[in-house]
């Protein structure tokens, strides 16, 4: 328990794992428990750098004339083997290997390769043959083999000859020096610091719009699009640049002086008068933080206006010390009042107009939405997987005073990018899955920064709900929420970095036999970073895509670009389409709209179930992928206009599906009666806590231990928690002989477990 950052007991995790719907198999429970146990027991092993270097196969030496034998006679294979075995066991040889960069792992690999090279070859190089002959005749020493062995080892492991070059390429200690054009001018850095709804971005944008030239760098397409629209409405021609889209304030042939873009698309080669970097606290993001670091260090602008949390100030000042710049700080207070309520919501019966329930999982979104609509209230739904148009439509529906929809259910996707008129934020849970900088999945209490960002959405300036309120759904979460919101966000300590395509190309030049995934691993493990200011961003998504298309013949630069594509690797359909597109590209065949239609099931139909809706969302992401690639490989993705039109049509269909999400939920459950579905598998029914089956004996415990999903220590801890719970309940339950309280549709599944458990305990 000591090595766990979670606020969930082991018993609680087992409840989440084991008490599922009746149709769930025990294998599913094992998989879920595997993930739960992983959170408690996983410690990332230290990587031995040498194991990342894959040996290069050395072809056998061919000499049809066998000059070595003519000069010094034939060599017996058995005698050669004795010499080689003695050679590999000598301490002096191992010491020489260490001096030449061959650690124990590399020695073992190189010795094995050298032995096979000598034994399996029909004949040897002349100089090596003569050396072996001298040793067998007593005219030479066994150590004389070392120069030939070292030559072979450097052929097997080419990095031995270029280790200094590799280290120099991956020296990331001074990223500010990568941007010589930005360092050549004196930039004015202005930090607009304040909480949500404080007007900090407004003041930065006013300066942006008044400048002769400017660029806005935002975290989301929605924010960039909003700036694009506002600038053009106010008479300032502005272009839009995102990964998947280009729009022009004047015309395609005449670029506007102002640009609104997503932060990854920021140009560090174009000079501007004013640059605005929004949500600078994202510089610490484990996946995308590098983009904010690049923009902050690389923008060529007379004025760089940075907006975000005050917690980023110390880090920005330290980074500016390395560039010789200073930071002008402008602090802002919240424009409207925000009150944390003293009572939890407790029940969905207490929902009132203007409420927004924030959930951290799709299945909670579905469950809460249906429960609210069952009470006769219309619901707007927003989560990260929805297309931007659908999000805007749902936001407009909720914001419209004339619309009957007065309640919203959303994920933390509402934290930025949408203007919402919310009276009260209700946290359905405080437990949120996240990914740390090492690429490990964590379940933890929501961070102070995230909680304040979401809570701050309540009570917006100049809307019908200027006074905002915040509370929790569960009474047991309320005190924790109050403590979180009373705290100041922790100062941001590090900014993200990421290998560039140029750096990886240089690595590939020195290590031509290594795969892209392998090159990334070597780079990350070999790089030097000033960890007082920076960290290396997580590359697991990049590696996942690199390994997926490793067998596809692509040039390195194209392979790198493909692996940078914004893909959710948890969506199998999107991943399979990514692979198909890569194969088509590798054959130099255009990826046409017909290709997309054929593989995505066009024309699209209205979704009838949640599974249909999820699939349409995946198809939308595939079209996003096409558009993203079309701006990078225009010749082989020639029909972006057709795909964009189809995507707009699909967006409208998804909107209609989300508008009737409750009916989709009903259809899903009706169609899955008596069978297991992907949706049902993911859904955990919220029930009062039934008794746990005995963990001290039985087939399940044995299987968990045998598969390594539970350790004896974890099992002991579980027993202690179980006994403590039963002891606390014994007084109140001593005269009761009732079944556990469950939902009616789960009763058959749980009652048998409960009876068996009580029989065992009575025995």
From Swiss-Prot:
It is found in: Mitochondrion. Disruption phenotype: Lethal due to mitochondrial dysfunction. 3 days after egg laying (ael) larvae display a severe decrease in size and a significant increase in mitochondrial mRNA steady-state levels which results in larval lethality by 4 days ael. RNAi-mediated knockdown is pupal lethal. Larvae display significant increases in mitochondrial mRNA and anti-sense RNA steady-state levels but rRNA (12S and 16S) steady-state levels and de novo transcription are not affected. Larvae also display severe decreases in mitochondrial tRNA steady state levels and accumulation of unprocessed precursor transcripts. Keywords: ATP-binding, Helicase, Hydrolase, Mitochondrion, Nucleotide-binding, Transit peptide. Residues 727-741 have a biased composition (Polar residues). Coiled coil: none annotated. ATP binds at residues 194-201. It is an enzyme of class 3 (hydrolase). Gene3D superfamilies: 1.10.1740.140, 1.20.272.40, 1.20.58.1080, P-loop containing nucleotide triphosphate hydrolases (3.40.50.300). GO terms for cellular component: mitochondrial degradosome; mitochondrial matrix; mitochondrion. The keyword Hydrolase applies. Residues 330-508 form the Helicase C-terminal domain. It comes from the Eukaryota. GO terms for biological process: mitochondrial mRNA catabolic process; mitochondrial mRNA polyadenylation; mitochondrial RNA 3'-end processing; mitochondrial RNA processing; mitochondrial tRNA processing; positive regulation of mitochondrial translation; regulation of mitochondrial mRNA stability. Residues 1-43 form a transit peptide. Its EC number is 3.6.4.13. Residues 181-321 form the Helicase ATP-binding domain. InterPro entries: DEXQc_SUV3, Helicase_C-like, P-loop_NTPase, RNA-DNA_Helicase, SUV3_C, Suv3_C_1, Suv3_DEXQc, Suv3_N. Residues 724-763 are annotated as: Disordered. PANTHER family: ATP-DEPENDENT RNA AND DNA HELICASE, ATP-DEPENDENT RNA HELICASE SUPV3L1, MITOCHONDRIAL-RELATED. This is ATP-dependent RNA helicase SUV3 homolog, mitochondrial. The lineage of its organism: Eukaryota, Metazoa, Ecdysozoa, Arthropoda, Hexapoda.
């Amino acid at each position: 328990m000591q090595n766990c950052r979670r606020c969930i007991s082991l018993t609680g995790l087992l409840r989440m794992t084991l008490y599922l719907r009746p149709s769930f198999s025990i294998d599913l429970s094992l998989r879920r428990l595997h993930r739960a146990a992983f959170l408690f027991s996983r410690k990332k092993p230290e990587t031995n750098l040498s194991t990342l270097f894959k040996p290069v196969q050395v072809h056998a030496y061919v000499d049809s004339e066998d000059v070595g034998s003519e000069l010094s006679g034939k060599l017996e294979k058995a005698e050669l083997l004795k010499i080689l075995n003695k050679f590999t066991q000598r301490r002096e040889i191992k010491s020489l290997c260490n001096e030449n960069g061959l650690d124990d792992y590399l020695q073992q690999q190189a010795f094995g390769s050298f032995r096979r090279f000598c034994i399996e070859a029909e004949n040897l190089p002349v100089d090596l043959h003569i050396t072996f002959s001298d040793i067998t005749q007593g005219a030479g020493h066994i150590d004389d083999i070392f120069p030939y062995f070292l030559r072979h080892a450097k052929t097997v492991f080419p990095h031995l000859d270029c280790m200094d070059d590799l280290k120099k390429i991956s020296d990331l200690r001074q990223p500010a020096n990568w941007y010589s054009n930005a360092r050549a001018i004196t930039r004015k850095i202005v930090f607009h610091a304040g909480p949500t709804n404080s007007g900090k971005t407004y003041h930065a944008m006013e300066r942006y719009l008044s400048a002769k030239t400017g660029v806005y760098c935002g975290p989301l397409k929605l924010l960039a699009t909003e700036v694009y629209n506002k600038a053009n409405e106010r008479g300032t021609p502005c272009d839009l640049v995102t990964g998947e889209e280009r729009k022009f304030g004047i015309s395609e042939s005449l670029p506007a002086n102002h640009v609104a873009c997503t932060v990854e698309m920021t140009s560090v080669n174009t000079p501007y008068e004013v640059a605005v970097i929004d949500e600078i606290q994202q510089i610490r993001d484990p996946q995308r933080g590098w983009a904010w670091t690049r923009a902050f260090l690389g923008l060529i602008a007379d004025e760089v206006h940075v907006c975000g949390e005050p917690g980023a100030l110390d880090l920005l000042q330290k980074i500016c010390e390395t560039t010789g710049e200073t930071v002008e700080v402008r602090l802002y207070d919240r424009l409207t009042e925000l009150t944390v309520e003293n009572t939890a919501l407790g029940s969905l019966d207490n929902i009132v107009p203007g409420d927004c329930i924030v959930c951290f999982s799709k299945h909670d979104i579905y469950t809460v939405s249906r429960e609210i609509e069952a009470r006769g209230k219309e619901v707007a739904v927003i989560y990260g997987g929805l297309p931007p148009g659908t999000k805007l439509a749902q936001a407009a529906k909720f914001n419209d005073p004339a619309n009957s929809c007065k309640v919203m259910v959303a994920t933390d996707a509402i934290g930025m990018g949408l203007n919402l008129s919310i009276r009260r934020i209700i946290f359905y849970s405080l437990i949120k899955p996240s990914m740390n900088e090492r690429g490990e999945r964590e379940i933890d209490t929501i961070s102070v920064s995230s909680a304040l960002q979401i809570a701050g959405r309540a009570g917006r300036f100049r809307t019908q709900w200027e006074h905002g309120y915040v509370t929790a759904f569960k009474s047991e979460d309320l005190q924790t929420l109050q403590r979180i919101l009373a705290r100041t966000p922790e100062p941001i300590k590090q900014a993200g970095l990421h290998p560039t395509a140029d750096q990886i190309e240089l690595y590939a030049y020195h290590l031509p036999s290594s795969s892209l995934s392998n090159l990334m691993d070597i780079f990350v493990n070999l790089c030097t970073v000033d960890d007082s200011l920076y960290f290396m961003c997580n590359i697991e998504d990049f590696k996942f895509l690199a390994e997926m298309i490793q067998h596809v013949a692509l040039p390195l630069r194209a392979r790198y670009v493909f692996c940078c594509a914004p893909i959710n690797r948890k969506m199998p359909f999107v991943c399979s389409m990514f692979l198909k597109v890569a194969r088509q590209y590798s054959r130099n065949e255009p990826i046409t709209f017909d290709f997309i239609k054929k593989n995505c099931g066009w024309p699209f139909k209205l979704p009838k179930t949640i599974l249909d809706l999820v699939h349409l969302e995946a198809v939308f992401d595939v079209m996003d992928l096409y558009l993203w690639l079309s701006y990078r490989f225009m010749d082989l993705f020639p029909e972006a206009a057709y795909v964009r039109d189809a995507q707009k049509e699909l967006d409208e269909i998804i909107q209609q599906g989300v508008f009737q999400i409750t009916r989709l939920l009903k259809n899903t459950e009706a169609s899955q009666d008596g069978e297991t579905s992907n949706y049902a598998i993911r859904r955990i029914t919220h029930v009062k806590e039934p008794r746990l089956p005995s963990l001290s004996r039985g087939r399940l415990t044995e299987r968990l231990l045998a598969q390594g999903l539970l350790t004896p220590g974890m099992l002991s801890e579980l027993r202690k928690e179980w006994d403590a719970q039963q002891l606390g309940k014994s007084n109140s339950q001593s005269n009761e002989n009732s079944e556990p309280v469950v939902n009616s549709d789960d009763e058959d599944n749980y009652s048998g477990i409960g009876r068996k458990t009580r029989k065992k305990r009575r025995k």
